[in-house]
A protein has these predicted regions:
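Conserved glycine-rich cofactor-binding loop
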Residues: 12-13
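Rossmann-fold cofactor-recognition segment
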Residues: 47-63
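Conserved mid-core segment of classical short-chain dehydrogenase/reductases
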Residues: 82, 91-108, 127, 152
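Residue(s) in the substrate-gating loop at a strand-loop-helix junction
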Residues: 143
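Catalytic Tyr-X3-Lys loop
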Residues: 100-119, 163
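Conserved glycine-rich Rossmann-like NAD(P)H-binding loop of the short-chain dehydrogenase/reductase
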Residues: 26-42
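Active-site-adjacent segment of SDR/Rossmann-fold oxidoreductases
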Residues: 148, 169-181
Length: 217
C-alpha cells in the first residue's frame, strides 16, 4: 500500500502541465482531466514507466465530469493506495474588459470551470474516498485576484474568491469528520503561462491595470 493517487485538472498546458510532469512517478497513479490531451505528458509518462491516464473532458460541463470521477475512484481498490489527492487547477478567462462586453456563455464557462467544477469534483472525490484508510487531500489553485479585485476580469476574480471561501468552508466540514480530508488553497503568484500572455496582450482600455500587472512578471 505505497501508491499515491493524484487527480489533477487543467493538465494540458501551463502550470497544470508542469505539475503533472512533477507528479510522474512509478508509485504515483495520476489521472489528468482537461479539454485536450497532453501528448508530451503522455510520452514522458511512458518513458518514466509512470502510471498516467488522461480524460479529455470539458469542465464547463462539471456534472458529467464529477459523476465520472466518482464512479472511477469507486472502482479502485482502496487498499492499494496509501493516500489520495485532488488538485483543482483548471480555470477559464473571459475576454478582458467589463462583464457587459463579454458573452454570457463566456461568463458562465468562467464560473463553471473555475468554481462549480471544483465544488462538484471535490464532492465526488470525498464521497468516493470516504472509506479510504489513507490521508485525503484537496488542493485548490487560487490566485491573488481572488483576494484583490482587478478591473477587466470580474468573472475570474469572482471564481477565485469563491474558491478561497469554498476551501475555508470545506476545511471546517472535514475537520469535524474522523480522518477528514485536508483542504487548502494556494495562490502561486504571477507565472509565465498562456493565461498571463492573454492578460498582458489585452486592450488597455478594458484592462486599466495592465501596466502594473505586467510589471509583476
Amino acid at each position: 500500500m505505497t501508491r499515491q493517487l493524484f487527480v489533477l485538472t487543467g493538465a494540458s498546458r501551463g502550470m497544470g502541465a508542469a505539475m503533472a510532469e512533477q507528479l510522474l512517478a512509478a508509485d504515483h497513479h495520476l489521472r489528468c482531466i482537461a479539454r485536450h490531451r497532453n501528448d508530451a505528458l503522455a510520452a514522458k509518462a511512458q518513458a518514466a514507466a509512470a502510471p498516467c491516464e488522461q480524460w479529455a473532458l470539458d469542465l464547463a460541463q462539471p456534472v458529467e465530469a464529477a459523476a465520472r470521477l466518482q464512479n472511477w475512484i469507486g472502482s479502485l481498490d482502496a487498499a492499494a493506495y496509501a493516500g489520495a489527492t485532488l488538485i483543482n487547477n483548471a480555470a477559464a478567462l473571459t475576454r478582458i474588459g467589463p462583464i457587459d462586453d463579454c458573452l454570457d456563455a463566456e461568463l458562465s464557462a468562467a464560473l463553471r470551470v473555475g468554481l462549480e467544477a471544483p465544488l462538484l469534483l471535490t464532492a465526488a472525490f470525498l464521497r468516493a474516498t470516504r472509506g479510504w484508510a489513507g490521508p485525503k487531500r484537496v488542493l485548490n489553485i487560487s490566485s491573488g485576484l481572488g483576494r484583490r479585485a482587478m478591473a477587466g476580469q470580474a468573472s475570474y476574480c469572482a471564481a477565485k474568491a469563491g474558491l478561497d471561501h469554498l476551501t475555508r468552508a470545506l476545511a471546517l466540514d472535514e475537520a469535524q469528520r474522523p480522518f477528514g480530508a485536508k483542504v487548502v488553497s494556494l495562490a502561486p503568484g504571477v507565472i509565465d503561462t498562456d493565461m498571463q500572455v492573454a492578460l498582458c496582450a489585452g486592450d488597455p482600455a478594458g484592462f486599466p491595470e495592465q501596466a502594473h500587472f505586467f510589471s509583476l512578471k
